[in-house]
Amino acid sequence: MVLFMTRKKREQIGDEIDDLLMRQYHHRCKLEEAQQAGNEERVQYEKNKIEEEELQIQKLRKKLA
């Protein structure tokens, strides 16, 4: 079992986290638009996407710890 993570792997995980954070920001913007438009179905969809991405981010952060 490897007790350490290579620099390349850490950078890859960091890039994945950055990508998820950007997508999460995008969904937060779409959520705000849906709330202003009163589209409850779209609001729920965006909330679900934000939550999914947050779970993925947490999993990746655990890998780095």
Pin down the residues of each PLM region.
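Short intrinsically disordered terminal tails
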Residues: M1-M5, K62-A65
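Short, charge/polar-rich alpha-helical segments
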Residues: V2-M22, R42
